[in-house]
Amino acid sequence: MEICPFVRLLDWRTLRAADCLTARQSREVDRFAIEELGISSLVLMENAARSVCDWFSQHVQASSSEETSFVVRVVCGRGNNGGDGFAIARLLWTMGYAVEIFATHPEAELAPDARVNAALARKLGIPWREMREFGEAAASARAEDWIVDAILGTGQSRPLSGVLAELVQGMNASLSRRLAVDLPTGFSADAGPGLGNPLTEQPHELVELCVRADVTVTFVTPKMGMLHPGAREYLGETFVASIGLPEKLLREAVSLQ
């Protein structure tokens, strides 16, 4: 079932390694688009955000009644995945959704494109809450609410620990539905979902170090980690979204490596 020309449901039955990109290849696609084709990184970010919002507009109707309203809590990291999140928050807000932003880092510490989209979201007056409030907000959320995970995407390079590990566990414990932008936090583009033990006082207890998404909207192509046997448990219903690159040029970018 296709939602629109730019967002399609992933068919797990036909997924092959040849269909997937590694984290390195994903970075090369972005580099090729920006440096070789001259497409602005902000344009790519906007296209990615619009694809996620296309999914929302098809599946999650904005409520016009306070009695039936729900909240979309967008959790944004410091890098480009966070930039996608700020843009998603802005677009959903203009579409009539009730949105709250939680940022893992101060604006001064954000990557340049993320900072641009954070500033735009600020100017629109979208509610911006302190990160320390997220645990309480997630714990008191209703099943109708949504958490948009825009923390790391394909940018994860090592297992989660500390504050990020606690944040992931808080997301998974929430009644909210969860949508992952590109990949759930803790899900490696190359290796799949993460397990580990950041809790030193319980050295023999394995805990989940990966967001359990109900929906994942991944960009350009599936990722190699999606071939992991346990991947679907963390990705949920998975969609592949275009960011505006023709397939022929995409193949050319990957073949250059």
UniProtKB/Swiss-Prot annotation:
Keywords: Isomerase, Metal-binding, NAD, NADP, Nucleotide-binding, Potassium
InterPro entries in the cross-refs: YjeF_N_dom (IPR004443), YjeF_N_dom_sf (IPR036652)
Span of domain YjeF N-terminal: 26-251
EC number assigned by the record: 5.1.99.6
Co-factor requirement: K(+)
Gene3D superfamilies for the chain: YjeF N-terminal domain
Annotated positions binding K(+): 81, 149, 185
Cofactor binding comment, as recorded: Binds 1 potassium ion per subunit.
Catalytic activity from the UniProt record: (6R)-NADHX = (6S)-NADHX; (6R)-NADPHX = (6S)-NADPHX
Keyword match NADP: yes
One MF term in the entry's GO annotations: nucleotide binding
UniProt KW Nucleotide-binding keyword: yes
Binding site for (6S)-NADPHX: 80-84, 153-159, 182
UniProt cross-references to Pfam families, sorted A to Z: YjeF_N
Role of this protein: Catalyzes the epimerization of the S- and R-forms of NAD(P)HX, a damaged form of NAD(P)H that is a result of enzymatic or heat-dependent hydration. This is a prerequisite for the S-specific NAD(P)H-hydrate dehydratase to allow the repair of both epimers of NAD(P)HX.
Family of the protein in this entry: Belongs to the NnrE/AIBP family.
Protein name: NAD(P)H-hydrate epimerase
Organism, as annotated: Planctopirus limnophila (strain ATCC 43296 / DSM 3776 / IFAM 1008 / Mu 290)
Lineage: Bacteria, Pseudomonadati, Planctomycetota, Planctomycetia, Planctomycetales
